[in-house]
Regions:
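Short alpha-helical interface elements
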Residues: 32-33, 114, 154-157
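Charged, amphipathic alpha-helical linkers/stalks
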Residues: 145-161
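A surface-exposed partner-binding patch
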Residues: 1-105, 182, 190-242
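Generic alpha-helical structural element
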Residues: 8-11, 118-122, 166
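Intrinsically disordered, low-complexity segments enriched in Gly and acidic/Ser/Thr residues
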Residues: 162-196
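Compact, glycine/acidic-enriched structural inserts
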Residues: 110-148
Length: 242
């Protein structure tokens, strides 16, 4: 029994088949616990990037003990309702965690939920893991932190992450990412109105000043609506953890 099967048996939960494939392919192994990770491990991982390596300090969770501890911690410390089964599979910056949500119809693949820790609430951000990967790959080149250590070899990094990720997308999704990743960085003017809510569908943060990216705010939103459509009505996507 591998660690994923142990989690499935413990919580009567079924990971998506694609997640098992990512596990078997070593795409969840970031070796985060090793000392001098940024100096020694990260440069090696960049050559064959694991799952969404360059996204918002994204770190896939591959330690079953850590996963179980997170599930139980969320139940006790965050007061998760009994009807929710949230199985964590990644963490991001500032304590945010991505989960599989075992919803009311367990015969369907679990949806992807992101817990925004500071807001004590979570939101459905993808109907399935494949669409979430598309969303992650798109977001990497939509919001670029100019001082990021990876920017010096930006084009090499995105070429590498496309190479290791495209087989987990649909053919059409992969073609869209390939076309965008072949672009050159462009300076875009700010398009957000001052009175506009900073968060919209997918909790998208529109740029509030001029920005550099491979695609504009408008194209980013259009592509997410087309290739990461969420079946849950917008008013029902966000729910409070406690």
């Amino acid at each position: 029994m591998n660690p994923l099967q142990h989690i499935e048996q413990t919580y009567n939960f079924q990971y998506p088949k694609l997640y098992h494939r990512l596990w078997e392919d070593g795409m969840l192994d970031v070796r985060w616990q090793k000392e001098r990770w940024w100096e020694e491990v990260f440069p090696e991982l960049k050559k064959n990037p694991p799952l969404l390596l360059f996204r918002d300090q994204f770190m896939g969770l591959d330690d079953p003990e850590e996963i179980v501890n997170l599930i139980e911690d969320y139940k006790s410390q965050r007061g998760i309702k009994a009807e929710y089964l949230l199985v964590p599979f990644a963490s991001e910056c500032e304590g945010d965690v991505c989960f599989f949500y075992h919803r009311e119809k367990p015969e369907l693949p679990p949806v992807i939920v992101k817990d925004w820790y500071d807001f004590d609430s979570a939101e459905i951000i993808a109907d399935n893991l494949q669409n979430f990967i598309f969303y992650g790959l798109l977001s990497i080149v939509y919001s670029i932190y100019a001082k990021a250590s990876s920017l010096s070899d930006f084009y090499e990094n995105i070429a590498n992450i496309y190479r290791t990720h495209h087989s987990y997308l649909s053919e059409e999704q992969a073609q869209v990412i390939k076309e965008i990743y072949n672009r050159k960085l462009t300076n875009f003017p700010c398009s957000a109105n001052k009175e506009e809510n900073r968060y919209s569908s997918y909790l998208i943060a529109k740029h509030l000043s001029d920005y550099t990216a491979l695609l504009s705010d408008e194209e980013y939103i259009d592509l997410l609506n087309k290739y990461n459509p969420i079946s849950t009505p917008e008013d029902d996507r966000e729910f409070f953890i406690i």
